[in-house]
């Protein structure tokens, strides 16, 4: 709504009288998305200053190591930290679960080397299948459970495996279980959220899309398939169970990653406040900054007074001159006299994708049925929706028959199929054009380098797996 601030008197009054801006789950704004949000908030502060408003900003976060610094980088303002937690809470049992060895997979492994450690690790049941078994056991015993996994296809496969685990469970029963992820259509997501909140579902298998922000009430237990990568994500996920004074159970099923093994051997790491990670966001990405500078110019002419909001004096003038040379900003404009206006032929805000850098999304259409599928970003389209790809979506299997790149809005054509298989894309990565900007040395002769470069990802092959066996 920033572009409409001067086109609608309602927005004029709103911005003029704004006194408080609240940003929830501030720790989530990192990476490319965090960079976009940081520039949107600076554009907001610029428009507010135009109307003489100076509201207070309040940011809520999970436990992070740098709350004040992160909030400042995100908004450009200064912050004080309130860290005392006075919220009510019940008892919580946290279980760290190591998948057992799979005897069949271990048979015949000994190659004569005498070192069976790697074989033991590879012969463990997968964390995904083990998590599904734990979820099934809890749900069939009347404990409403929310399971977290790392990938969208993992939620779909996990839902199938959970149903199968209930069939194999010694206690007869039936459960309602649904997958949940951002690729589902909005109506389907809202349906799952409402059914979970009303306890009509016994279990939901979700990506981190349900980790925060969405009101689903309180479940009895959470199951996390593999360590989610940060302590803040871990605590956010287990916090979905037993809100208020209700008791809760949370199970972390360890994966094959080295970090999972470390946590299973050193559980105190999860409870050590001295090892809380920092939230990381940067506004140094010039490509993102350039797009937001055009958006700011379309919202109101750029002047020298905007430098504090838009990158600082030198960077602001340099990027303005670049866009003037390109013809997207008024070439005759002057930052010091009258300002510089936007000269492009369409809304520059439409160029910006908060979750990536291309802004191009693929529409998914089904040629022999119906599919409610949100648009697919370019990177995901190349990785997961190539021709021949098999995938589960809302419990239905589909095959990609054609990818049409020629349309203004590219399309992925799929067909409903009857199969128990899915595809897993294989990739190679090359890092080129490295430019080292800084480095440091660590104990043990380890060097860490920081710099810029080009990462080239090639998707050339894929595997076909059975979602019931993983083979």
Predicted regions and their residues:
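Conserved helix/coil segment N-terminal to the catalytic DExD/H
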Residues: 1-19, 195
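Walker B catalytic acidic pair
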Residues: 24-25, 226
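Conserved C-terminal RecA-like helicase domain
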Residues: 71, 90, 126-127, 132, ...
């Amino acid at each position: 709504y920033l572009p409409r601030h001067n086109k609608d008197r309602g927005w004029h009054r709103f911005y003029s009288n704004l006194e408080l801006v609240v940003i929830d789950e501030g720790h989530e704004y990192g990476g490319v998305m965090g960079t976009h949000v940081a520039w949107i908030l600076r554009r907001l502060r610029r428009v507010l200053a135009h109307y003489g408003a100076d509201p207070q900003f309040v940011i809520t976060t999970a436990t992070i190591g740098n709350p004040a610094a992160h909030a400042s980088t995100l908004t450009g303002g200064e912050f004080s930290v309130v860290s005392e937690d006075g919220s009510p809470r019940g008892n919580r049992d946290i279980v760290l679960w190591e998948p057992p060895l799979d005897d069949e997979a271990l048979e015949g492994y000994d190659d004569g080397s005498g070192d069976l450690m790697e074989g033991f690790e590879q012969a463990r049941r997968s964390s995904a299948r083990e998590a599904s078994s734990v979820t099934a056991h809890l749900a069939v015993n009347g404990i409403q459970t929310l399971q977290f996994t790392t990938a969208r296809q993992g939620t779909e496969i996990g839902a199938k495996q959970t149903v199968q685990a209930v069939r194999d469970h010694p206690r007869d029963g039936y459960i309602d279980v649904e997958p949940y992820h951002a690729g589902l259509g909005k109506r389907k997501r809202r349906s799952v959220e409402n059914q979970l909140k009303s306890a009509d579902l016994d279990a939901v298998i979700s990506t981190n899309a349900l980790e925060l922000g969405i009101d689903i009430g309180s479940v009895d237990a959470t199951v996390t398939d593999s360590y989610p990568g940060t302590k803040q994500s871990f605590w956010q996920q287990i916090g979905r169970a037993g809100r208020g004074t209700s008791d809760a159970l949370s199970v972390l099923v360890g994966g094959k990653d080295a970090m999972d093994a470390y946590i299973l051997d050193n559980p105190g790491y999860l409870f050590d406040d001295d090892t809380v990670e920092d939230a990381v966001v940067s506004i140094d990405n010039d490509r993102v900054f350039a797009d937001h500078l055009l958006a700011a110019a379309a919202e109101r002419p750029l002047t020298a007074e905007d430098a504090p909001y838009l990158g600082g004096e030198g960077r602001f003038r340099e990027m303005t001159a670049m866009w003037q040379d390109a013809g997207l900003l008024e070439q005759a404009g002057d930052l010091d006299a009258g300002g510089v206006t936007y000269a492009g032929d369409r809304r520059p805000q439409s160029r910006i994708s908060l979750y990536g850098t291309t802004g191009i999304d693929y529409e998914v259409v089904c040629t022999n049925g119906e599919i409610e599928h949100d648009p697919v970003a370019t990177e995901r389209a190349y990785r997961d929706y190539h021709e021949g790809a098999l995938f589960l979506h809302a419990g239905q299997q589909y095959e990609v028959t054609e990818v049409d790149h020629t349309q203004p809005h590219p399309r992925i054509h799929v067909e409903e199929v009857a199969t128990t298989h899915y595809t897993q894309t294989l990739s190679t990565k090359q890092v080129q054009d490295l430019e080292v900007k800084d480095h440091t040395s660590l104990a043990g002769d380890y060097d860490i380098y920081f710099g810029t470069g080009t990462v080239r990802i090639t998707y050339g092959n894929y595997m076909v797996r059975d979602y019931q066996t993983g083979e």
